[in-house]
Amino acid sequence: YGVAAYPEKHEEAPNLEMDMKHLKEKQDLGAEYAVTQLFFDNEKYFSFVEKAHQMGITIPIVPGIKPFAKLSQITQVPKTFHCDMPQELAKEAVKCKTDDDAKALGVEWTTAQCKELYARGVKDIHFYTISAIDSVAQIAKNLL
């Protein structure tokens, strides 16, 4: 069975170390893989995976990715899911004036994000598709 993992720590965890200890406990209780909370900064994912390996976490940690599909998500998603937006993405996000702008940015950023994940050895990616199924379909085409 799969469990959740939080590269930027769960909002209720006092710190990342405690959150990772909790993930280790999940593994020790039989978890076979983990899917991360969404993130926009791949370095946070890779750092998390490295620390997990140092703690003896050996289950696959599948990155969870969500593209923006609407203008409102640019501000809502990072706040709701407690994830940081890299400066480069934030700089582009402020230029978005319409849902179409946000959707295009979401496809562009997420495609690049996935390409980097694959290039650095990630085998699987989980897409959070709520309000973004068309975007995810386009990203999948971009990755072919």
Short names for language-model regions:
Residues 2-12, 50, 54-107, 112, ...:
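Active-site pocket-lining/capping segments in soluble small-molecule metabolic enzymes
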Residues 13-17, 38-54, 132-143:
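Active-site-adjacent beta->alpha loops and helix N-cap segments on the catalytic face
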Residues 14-25, 106-116:
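Short, acidic/polar
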Residues 22-29, 39-40, 46:
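Membrane translocator/pore-forming domains, dominated by Gram-negative outer-membrane beta-barrels
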Residues 26, 30, 63, 125:
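Conserved, mostly hydrophobic/aromatic
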Residues 29, 113-124:
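A structural motif corresponding to the C-terminal end of an alpha-helix
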Residues 32-41, 126-129:
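Catalytic beta/alpha-barrel core
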Residues 110, 118-119, 127-132:
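A cross-taxonomic marker for long C-terminal extensions/tails that follow the last structured domain
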